[in-house]
Regions:
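Short aromatic-rich membrane-water interface segments that cap or initiate transmembrane helices
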Residues: 189-204, 269-287, 339-350
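Terminal, non-globular segments
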Residues: 93-108, 195-223, 239, 246-251, ...
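N-terminal signal-anchor module of multipass membrane proteins
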Residues: 1-55
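Internal/C-terminal transmembrane anchor helices
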Residues: 369-392
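Hydrophobic alpha-helical transmembrane segments in integral membrane proteins
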Residues: 384-413
Length: 501
């Protein structure tokens, strides 16, 4: 269309956007009030995507090619949140949902084909805050059509919803205080209601309304440039001078890794495996982020130069060896100290980083390569595998069965860290049940804890109760507090498994 700005269409459909956003704000509060990962969260995400698509239909914004990927992956993450009890996975799922939803909206309203990696990230991070400059828009849009009867009615409906929903909650809280039976039923659905929770609900409704309306008002303006700005690239010589010494340093470092670490000529020199693995990983992460920035700057701000391209390629290739070095050290660490969620995440991240570096190298020689989209797809697909894997199940299964190999040279002192098992998520319950059925009842009653002293050596202590009893009590407490909106499939299965159902 010639007129890219859709603000006029949004104002013409104020009745829909005003009432629809108010209802959406109520739906948001109903689903997410004191509910972080239950079935209501999954319904909220599904409802949100439907509402966004409905808004775009009103603005005559057609679903673009590639948008299905965003819609499907967001829903998969929402389903994953419902079927896992791991708070770390749930938190990362929500982060992924935010980035994918923001990318979906930007992709729908703007021609983002020529956006650079940094421009995409800038717009995604900026999107949650654009509503601040549009907080007045609901009132302005109404005022423009104030003489039209239907728009007066629309405003009255919006005001009625914004006032009526909080008032309903306050009265509901009073009724809960007046009758124990009514309070118990309400608590199973919404949790405890009082004046404090009423204030919180009012805030959630108002915040959801103004944030959602403001974001769509911003998107409707289509104020972002569709094309990458034409800039005169700088001479490549300064970049070459900066990158060549770094590349030489990387090559020396990689040679040392190959000769000393992979060649078996390595001496820990007093460092524990924990210190060595953690230092190696986080240092590598910093170097890889730096490499990404340097490569982006190299082909984004400097003229194409053969020497520069080769230098950046060698620098990126050296990172492969750094990744292999980090993975080798982490695997040795796991052999001695078993698995934890962080150690699994480190290994997963190294695999993802290897694939991402391939995209970075391609982008050096093919400037038009869509690095952001490539990175988005790689990270999303790999993370979905991690999210649906129920990591705690595999960690618990591995650690418990490794305990049966106590005394082997590769297993540090032949001990299982039972204190770690006590605090695992509901995803681990099935592994515990399988282990006990395989004859591990003695280990299930172990009361041994472990911690690391200042010298890195393991020290042991006696727990007040065995780890399985403590874990079962934790799961029972969570199951009892779950409620209808917070119903979680993993918590439900854990309760049945632990009690032999």
């Amino acid at each position: 269309m010639n007129d890219r700005n859709l603000t006029g269409k949004m104002k013409e459909n104020y009745r829909f956007f005003g009432i629809g956003t108010a209802l959406y704000a109520g739906f948001y509060t109903l689903c997410l009030y004191k509910n972080s990962g239950g079935i209501a969260f999954t319904f909220f995400i599904a409802g949100s995507l439907w509402f966004y698509c409905l808004c775009m239909k009103k603005l005559e914004v057609s679903l673009k090619k590639g948008s299905i990927f965003y819609l499907v992956t967001v829903m998969l993450l929402a389903v994953s949140t419902f079927i896992t009890g791991d708070g770390r996975i749930i938190a990362m799922n929500k982060t992924g949902i935010f980035f994918l939803t923001a990318s979906f909206l930007l992709h729908q309203f703007f021609e983002d084909k020529n956006w650079s990696f940094f421009k995409y990230m800038e717009n995604i991070i900026k999107l949650p805050f654009v509503w601040i400059a549009k907080v007045h828009r609901p009132f302005v849009d109404f005022h423009k059509k104030e003489n039209e009867k239907q728009d007066n009615n629309a405003l009255y409906v919006v005001l009625g919803l914004l006032v009526g929903i909080p008032l309903l909650i306050v009265v509901w809280g009073l009724l809960c205080a007046a009758d124990a039976a009514f309070a118990r039923i309400s608590r199973n659905i919404f949790g405890s209601l009082n004046f404090g929770s009423g204030f919180q609900i009012v805030f959630m409704v108002l915040a959801a309304f103004f944030v959602t309306y403001g974001i769509f008002a911003y998107l409707a303006e289509r104020s972002l440039s569709d094309e990458a700005r034409e800039k005169t690239p700088a001479e490549a010589l300064p970049a070459i001078i900066v990158l060549i010494p770094l590349t030489v340093l990387y090559m020396v470092f990689c040679w040392i890794q190959i000769f000393c670490l992979f060649g078996g000529n390595f001496n820990m020199q007093g460092m524990t495996y924990a210190e060595y693995a953690r230092r190696g990983f986080f240092d590598l992460l910093a170097v890889c982020i730096l490499n990404l920035i340097l490569v982006q700057a190299g082909y984004g701000f400097f003229k194409k130069n053969k020497v520069l391209d080769i230098t950046m390629t060698v620098m990126s290739a050296c990172t492969y060896i750094m990744i292999a070095s980090s993975a080798f050290r982490m695997i040795q660490y796991v052999k001695h100290y078993n698995l934890t969620f962080l150690r699994v995440f480190v290994l997963w991240f190294l695999v993802v980083l290897t694939v991402l570096l391939t995209g970075v190298i391609i982008s050096i020689f093919k400037r038009s390569f869509p690095l952001f989209r490539f990175s988005m797809v790689v990270v999303t697909v790999c993370y979905l595998l991690l999210s649906f894997a129920h990591v705690d199940y595999w960690i618990a299964s591995y650690n418990l069965h490794r305990g049966e190999t106590a005394g082997t040279a590769s297993y540090h002192m032949g001990h299982t860290d039972y204190s770690y098992l006590r605090y695992m998520s509901s995803d681990a319950a099935l592994a515990f049940r399988e282990y006990i059925e395989d004859g591990g009842k003695e280990a299930a009653s172990a009361d041994e804890g472990v911690w690391y002293g200042e010298d890195g050596e393991r020290e042991y202590f006696v727990l007040e109760e065995d780890w399985l009893t403590y874990y079962t009590k934790r799961m029972d407490t969570r199951y009892e507090k779950m409620g209808i909106r917070g119903f979680n499939l993993s918590q439900y299965i854990a309760n049945k498994v632990l009690h032999g159902n």
